[in-house]
Amino acid sequence: MNKQTIRDVAWSGKRALVRVDFNVPLDQARKVTDDTRIRAALPTINYLLEQGASVILMSHLGRPKKKVAEEFRLKPVADHLQSLLDAPVNYIQTTTGAEAEAAAQALQAGQVLLLENTRFDPREESNDPAMAEELAKLGDIYVNDAFGAAHRAHASTEGLAKFLPAVAGFLMEAELAALGKALDDPQRPFVTIIGGAKISDKIGVIENLLGKVDSLLIGGGMANTFLLAQNKAVGASLVEADSVAEAGRLIDEAQGRGVKLLLPSDVVVADAFSAEANTQVLSIDDVPDGWRILDIGPETRQTYSQVVSEAKTVIWNGPMGVFELEPFAAGTRAVAQALADSSAITIIGGGDSVAAIEQMGLAEKMSHISTGGGASLELLEGKVLPGIAALNDK
């Protein structure tokens, strides 16, 4: 990565203005139910504190409609962060202006301040330079550690870098190192597994990867559209009629490039979208009318696992079936297990894939678990992410 990081700065006595991604789920009682993203920022926060900086944190939470909404205040996140840090965590109900400036000025080395939800300000999402300039008054150096928001050109992710020296935090650095190395200089065979419901979300990703990978394994609802492009009957399965021609073109392109594009050879079908539905395992040539494909079958699971076992680099994004319903979780679990058993570099992106890995207790077995859904997809598409482009070059 040719961007400056927090290691390139002398922090003693400086105020670090850090964009983190604390967009975490809360329950009815407003308690954090999954703190993965908060924990992911701790190495950066702790390093800055150890180096003698004071730390001012900015994040969004949820999708407030560009105004204050009580249920999206960051107070529960501040409380949770305090339970994970020895340093005192202060929280204020504002993001910019006199109160924020006074709180930032008063902060001592070794202390933390969490600002209010950046998206309460309508100027955040329009990347208004006036908001970025107001935020810049709060710190000396800007640190972007919010990989999950790096694909958005907002005031706190991109605009701010025009007003302060801008460097990457450890999480941002790790994400770029893992995904960047896999895409630019992978150990081969390089295999990508793409799943999830919609092909339309991932056409750009597949397009970009066809120029890089040795094998592409496809599962989830999107596989149905590819199967339809091969004139397979898919019954009442989810398909994107608008994308069938596109899927056919990608199949041809893979062939032309010598990339192995694998689709399910057998599937788990059900007569309804329900955990209580009648199910059967059938060859892809035998899917009856009125039944829907909800998972890859055992033969496909074995084939995909075999390809993974021979790989040196694997990127997995998206589940193989409707993994939240128990009868259709086996495909996703098989892929997760194959990755855990593999000696390859394994990179997991996308919320559902990550959830499957976490649920099975296999997170420790993976080389890298990406915290950014949309951001990692756009990186896989070969796009330049505004939040990263804005950082100072080395």
Curated annotation (Swiss-Prot):
Pathway: Carbohydrate degradation; glycolysis; pyruvate from D-glyceraldehyde 3-phosphate: step 2/5. GO terms for cellular component: cytosol. Its main location: cytoplasm. InterPro entries: Phosphoglycerate_kinase, Phosphoglycerate_kinase_N, Phosphoglycerate_kinase_sf. The keyword RNA-binding does not apply. One of its GO terms (biological process) is gluconeogenesis. It catalyses: (2R)-3-phosphoglycerate + ATP = (2R)-3-phospho-glyceroyl phosphate + ADP. Belongs to the phosphoglycerate kinase family. This is Phosphoglycerate kinase. It comes from Herpetosiphon aurantiacus (strain ATCC 23779 / DSM 785 / 114-95). The lineage of its organism: Bacteria, Bacillati, Chloroflexota, Chloroflexia, Herpetosiphonales.
